[in-house]
Amino acid sequence: MKILLSGAGGFVGRQAAMELAAAGHQVLTTDRSGAVDLPGDLSDEQFCRGLPDVDAVVHGAAVQYVSADLPLGARRAYFQRNNVEATRLLCRRYAGAPTHFIYIGTSMMYAQDGSMLYTVRSPMAGQGIYSRSKLAALRFVRQLPNPHATVLPCIIGGPGREGLFRPFVAMAKRGTVAYPGEGRNPISMVHVADVASLIRHVVASRAKGLFNAAAADALCIEQWIDLIQAQLGMRRVRRLRIPLAPVRGLSWLTGYRLLAREQLLMLARPHVLAIEESLALGWRPLYDSARIVRDTADFLHKPSHHPVDPGVRRQNT
């Protein structure tokens, strides 16, 4: 199968490219930068028009709060151009063609309302600029006459991931870990290899609908810290809980560079995904949450043991 993979220079994109190629597919990669087949900007109409005919599109390209080129101002326009307009143009390019369209979303698109479990039937709501842009993009995908599917990963871990894990590992090395909130709400996570595997299953079955990507279990932040402490071989790590209110204020002042608004909601409430629809495709997550935390902590503690292509920008989606 001939597949166009957007966002191929990113954390998930690199893994998905390897997974799909190993399954025997011809993978054409595209991104704004990095070692890809078709470098270009999907928000450029001319570039999108020139994209080749393919059997499937896996659309993983997106920007978020921690993107390297996030501007200090005009952020709404930035997310609109890179997430919404890019998706609109990509959908227009392949609308009506015999092309299966797979959109990579985020579990932040669910309305974080305190539910103990988020299923593919749970309501969605944009609760920050990022999730609003991803939902706006999803509307174009849902308007396609083509068969289409959406993969919704939760927090993604594994070698190469940084995000919230980097400060936790750095603080643990110093003997004290400070974290916002109580740290006792279960939060789903998923290994990047399992996300790529789910994408492969969706492509292979030409599946339609929504598919959550998460490990079979969920841990809380306190448990993450226990695992990081053990992985680093630390005898004692002090915990320091920070009330969420001042963290929310600081995040707002930094334009949610410190923590995304959606992440703040996740810290205050459970965020656990149901994966029945994904399991029905024959997909099985190979990594439990403890293994994901350990692998990510090990990468951050000993990065030389897990080389990352230096020509590729690290991303956090």
Feature map (PLM): residue ranges:
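Mid/C-terminal beta-alpha module of Rossmann-like enzyme folds, strongest
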Residues: 201-261, 290, 294-297, 303-317
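N-terminal Rossmann NAD(P)H-binding glycine-rich loop of SDR-like oxidoreductase domains
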Residues: 3-23
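Conserved C-terminal active-site "lid" loop/helix of NAD(P)H-dependent oxidoreductases
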Residues: 192, 226, 250-285
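Conserved beta-loop-beta element that borders a ligand/cofactor-binding pocket
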Residues: 106, 138-159
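NAD(P)H-binding glycine-rich loop region in Rossmannoid oxidoreductase-like domains
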Residues: 41-84, 93
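Glycine-rich NAD(P)-binding loop of the Rossmann-fold in SDR/ketoreductase-type enzymes
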Residues: 78-89, 128, 132-133, 190
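Substrate-positioning beta->alpha
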Residues: 132, 161-167, 181-203, 209-212
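Conserved Rossmann-fold NAD(P)-dependent oxidoreductase catalytic core, especially the SDR/UDP-sugar
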Residues: 85-129, 149
